[in-house]
């Protein structure tokens, strides 16, 4: 009898991995561990602010130089300390140098297959929008892009990323605190948008109306 447990167990482990990574991101954004979230938030903001002030080549160069300054200084310090104390503790980074940090083929294939599934889903949705499978959805995209032309005239990409990070690390906390009130207003907006959409669909020609429904 053929063993069919392989693909199924692989799918289950992949789903579990996605749920685990999703929970980790959620914990970061909800500040479950203040120290860890603070480090990620601070590091991301420093990187984005650096990219806003300098070119990406300069930022990468400064990051590499900073890291080398720390590791070289520590390496020289430990060597001098061993010479003064006449000890032979060996290379200070020996445990890290001996650690296996190679990326396994299974992990790479799993990440690739997961990414490919998301890319294919996004491509299919983009094709539907541009080929007007649903007229209302395509009109929503056109309206969004029209609004983005005004946003792009005021903000550049890095500024939008900075605002996005600020929102990502503050909005979940605000939502968690005022969940009932926010859900109430979101429901009102959703009902209003749905009402407008239904009015637009009612005025569409017969063929387009059927397609959008």
UniProtKB/Swiss-Prot annotation:
Job of this protein: May be involved in membrane trafficking in the early secretory pathway.
Reticulon domain location: 25-213
Gene Ontology BP annotations: negative regulation of amyloid-beta formation; vesicle-mediated transport
Membrane topology category: Multi-pass membrane protein
Gene Ontology CC annotations of this record: endoplasmic reticulum; endoplasmic reticulum membrane; Golgi apparatus; Golgi membrane
Natural source organism: Xenopus tropicalis
Oligomer status and interactors: Homodimer.
Keywords of the record: Endoplasmic reticulum, ER-Golgi transport, Golgi apparatus, Membrane, Transmembrane, Transmembrane helix, Transport
Transmembrane segments: 45-65, 154-174
Lineage: Eukaryota, Metazoa, Chordata, Craniata, Vertebrata
Key word Transmembrane present: yes
Chief location of this protein within or outside the cell: endoplasmic reticulum
Protein name: Reticulon-3
Superkingdom field: Eukaryota
Composition skew (Polar residues), residue ranges: 1-16
Region (Disordered): 1-20
Name of the encoding gene: rtn3
One Pfam family per UniProt: Reticulon
Location within or outside the cell: Endoplasmic reticulum membrane; Golgi apparatus membrane
């Amino acid at each position: 009898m053929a063993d069919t447990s392989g693909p199924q167990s692989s799918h289950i482990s992949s789903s579990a991995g996605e749920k685990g990574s999703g929970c980790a991101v959620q914990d970061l954004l909800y500040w479950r561990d203040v120290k860890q979230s603070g480090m990620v938030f601070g590091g991301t903001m420093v990187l984005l602010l650096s990219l806003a002030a300098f070119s990406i080549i300069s930022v990468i160069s400064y990051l590499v130089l900073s890291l080398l300054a720390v590791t070289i200084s520590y390496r020289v310090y430990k060597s001098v300390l061993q010479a003064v104390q006449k000890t032979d503790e060996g290379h200070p980074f020996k445990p890290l140098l001996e650690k296996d940090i190679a990326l396994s083929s299974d992990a790479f294939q799993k990440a690739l297959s997961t990414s490919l599934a998301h890319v294919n889903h996004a491509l299919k949705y983009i094709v539907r929008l541009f080929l007007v499978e649903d007229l209302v959805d395509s009109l929503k995209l056109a309206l969004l892009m029209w609004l983005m032309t005004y946003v792009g005239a005021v903000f550049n990409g890095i500024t939008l990323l900075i605002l996005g990070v600020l929102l990502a690390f503050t909005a979940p906390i605000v939502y968690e605190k005022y969940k009932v009130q926010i859900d109430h207003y979101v429901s009102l907006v959703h009902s209003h948008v749905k009402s407008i959409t239904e009015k637009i669909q009612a005025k569409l020609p017969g063929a387009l109306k059927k397609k959008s429904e």
